[in-house]
């Protein structure tokens, strides 16, 4: 119990400390805010909870050009994990509710990250155009195509927005599997656990220029991303049920 209380206290401290540093850096440089404040926030938060991150096929993530990174979402610890793992500047597509979070919302806004609504709106159309325009010459973009967290870890239906962005932008798409966050923060039971392992795996980049245009291309991209993630997720579920 004492160790758990310590983790909570450290979480408040690290979020406050790195959040304040992010507030200072973000107006001047999103790159510095991400690579210093956000990355170390992820690392120290994972350390506070005793989380070990195991990464596979990191070399499949291009670092010399902008990409769209799509990941499966099951816990807020997914965000801490990719923040700790990805060493270069990125921007994330987030739900508008994030703007209400202390420090995180303000830092994200100042850093130029992107915000969309849960159910889609006219504002989202403008945000999509902004992402497509900026990613061609700017940093990589990270998004969760499910649009929300999966309680049991299984893939939820994908939203179309992320795939539309990828097809319009014409940049490679890298699929990133993150497994284990739900074992640290159990959303169903609203409880936290210590000393867990989170696994991260990257898959081969998808060249969207080789896909058909329009709806067929978008659907092909969606099925490819799902085809990477789903078998791996089912393997982890089987292992946990043994």
Q: What would you call each of these model-derived segments?
A:
Residues 125-242:
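Non-catalytic C-terminal accessory region of glycerolipid acyltransferases
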Residues 40-66:
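A short, well-structured juxtamembrane/interface segment
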Residues 55, 69, 92-93, 200-202:
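Generic preference for hydrophobic
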Residues 18-35, 47-49, 63-121:
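Catalytic core of membrane glycerolipid acyltransferases/transacylases, capturing the structured
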Residues 1-26, 36, 59-62, 133, ...:
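Membrane-interfacial terminal anchoring regions of lipid-handling membrane enzymes
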Residues 41, 78-81, 94, 103, ...:
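Hydrophobic alpha-helical segments typical of transmembrane helices
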Residues 56, 93-95, 117-118, 145, ...:
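Thr-Gly-centered strand-to-loop micro-motif
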């Amino acid at each position: 119990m004492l160790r758990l209380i310590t983790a909570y206290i450290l979480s408040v401290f690290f979020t406050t400390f790195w959040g304040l540093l992010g507030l200072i850096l973000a107006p001047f440089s999103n790159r510095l805010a991400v690579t210093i404040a956000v990355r170390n926030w992820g690392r120290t938060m994972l350390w506070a909870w005793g989380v070990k991150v195991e990464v596979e096929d990191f070399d499949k993530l291009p670092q010399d050009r902008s990409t769209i990174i799509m990941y499966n979402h099951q816990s807020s610890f997914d965000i801490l994990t990719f923040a700790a793992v990805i060493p270069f500047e990125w921007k994330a597509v987030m739900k508008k509710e994030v703007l209400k979070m202390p420090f995180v919302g303000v830092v994200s806004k100042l850093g130029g990250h992107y915000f969309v609504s849960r159910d889609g709106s006219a504002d989202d159309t403008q945000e999509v155009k902004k992402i497509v325009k900026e990613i061609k010459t700017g940093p990589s973009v990270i998004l969760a195509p499910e649009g929300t967290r999966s309680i049991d870890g299984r893939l939820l239906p994908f939203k179309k927005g992320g795939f539309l962005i990828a097809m319009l932008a014409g940049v490679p798409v890298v699929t990133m599997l993150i497994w284990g966050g739900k074992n640290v923060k159990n959303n169903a039971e609203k409880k936290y656990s210590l000393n867990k392992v989170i696994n991260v795996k990257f898959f081969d980049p998808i060249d969207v220029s080789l896909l058909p245009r329009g709806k067929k291309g978008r659907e092909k991209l969606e099925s490819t991303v799902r085809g990477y993630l789903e078998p791996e997720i089912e393997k982890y579920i089987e292992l946990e049920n043994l």
